[in-house]
């Protein structure tokens, strides 16, 4: 196994790049991963060059930045159309890795982050992982360990993007409903019978039945059970707890809800 073990003694400005015998090309899991981008943020030129060389050797695209500020400026203008992950040195002059992670959380969903450091301690690792980091690699590290971490992060980002598309699809369907249709959907979700709904909305039962059929069409539900599941998920999206979770970046609550949405929409 070939290793780009990278360690940096900043006090003595001594960079060590160890290499073992090379290996066969690392297999990328999917075409989607090959089209993904790995962002490298490290103030050490040799580290950036070594990582970009490693990623290029297995067919992965990368962009490197010497400072977190430079990445933030790029990220603000980037549309983020394809899956990506971030490989970041946790200790850098100016904005450090943990601070960068915090700033990204404030902007939007954070891409999977792989932290690396020659100086990382247990407390720092715990802080990074609690904030949502995917991995933490100490320098020096093996090429294979970095590639495994990167490919795992890219696969995770692809999955999260697919889940987000399912959520956006459900929200788009719900936005297409009129106020009365939304009220009808909520009452159906509450378990009310057609007669009860007709009484509350001052409608005939026939009109309620027609409204149900229209709801099925607009929500693209294949059956009534699926429609009720969609209504339950919409309530979850509207809850303050989940809304707060999106504002704070990806977390377990949002992930479980989006996974449920994806399952229901593909039933």
Question: Where in the sequence are the language-model features?
Answer:
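C-terminal output helix
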Residues: 121-123, 137, 141-151, 196, ...
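Conserved acidic segment of CheY-like receiver
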Residues: 34-47, 51-55, 68, 86-89, ...
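Acidic, metal-coordinating helix/loop segments flanking the phosphotransfer/catalytic sites
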Residues: 64-85
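Short amphipathic alpha-helix used as the core "switch/output" element in two-component signaling
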Residues: 73, 98-109, 127
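Recognition helix of helix-turn-helix DNA-binding domains
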Residues: 193-226
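Acidic catalytic/metal-coordinating carboxylates
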Residues: 66-67, 93-100
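Basic, Lys/Arg-enriched C-terminal extension of HTH/homeodomain DNA-binding domains
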Residues: 214-267
């Amino acid at each position: 196994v070939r290793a780009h073990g990278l360690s940096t003694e900043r006090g003595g400005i001594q960079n060590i790049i160890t290499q073992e015998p090379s290996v066969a090309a690392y297999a990328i899991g999917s075409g989607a991963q090959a089209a993904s981008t790995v962002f490298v943020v490290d103030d050490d030129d040799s580290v950036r060059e070594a990582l970009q060389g490693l990623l290029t050797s297995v067919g992965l695209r990368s962009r490197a930045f010497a400072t977190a500020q430079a990445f933030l400026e790029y990220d603000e203008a980037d549309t983020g159309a394809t899956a990506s992950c971030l490989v970041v040195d946790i200790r850098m002059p100016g904005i450090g890795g943990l601070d960068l992670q915090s700033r990204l959380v404030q902007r939007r969903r954070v891409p999977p982050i792989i932290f690396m450091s020659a100086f990382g301690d247990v407390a720092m690792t715990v802080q990074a992982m609690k904030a949502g980091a995917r991995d933490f690699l100490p320098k020096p590290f093996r090429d294979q360990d970095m590639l495994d971490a990167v490919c795992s992060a890219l696969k995770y980002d692809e999955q999260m993007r697919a889940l987000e598309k399912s959520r956006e699809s459900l929200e788009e369907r719900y936005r297409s409903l009129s106020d009365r249709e939304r009220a009808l959907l909520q009452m159906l979700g509450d378990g009310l019978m057609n007669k009860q709904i007709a009484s509350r909305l001052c409608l005939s039962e026939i009109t309620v039945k027609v409204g149900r059929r229209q709801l099925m069409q607009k929500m693209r539900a294949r059956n009534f059970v699926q429609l009720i599941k969609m209504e339950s998920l919409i309530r979850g999206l509207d809850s303050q707890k989940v809304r707060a979770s999106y504002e704070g970046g990806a977390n377990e609550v949002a992930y479980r809800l989006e996974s449920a949405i994806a399952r229901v929409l593909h039933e």
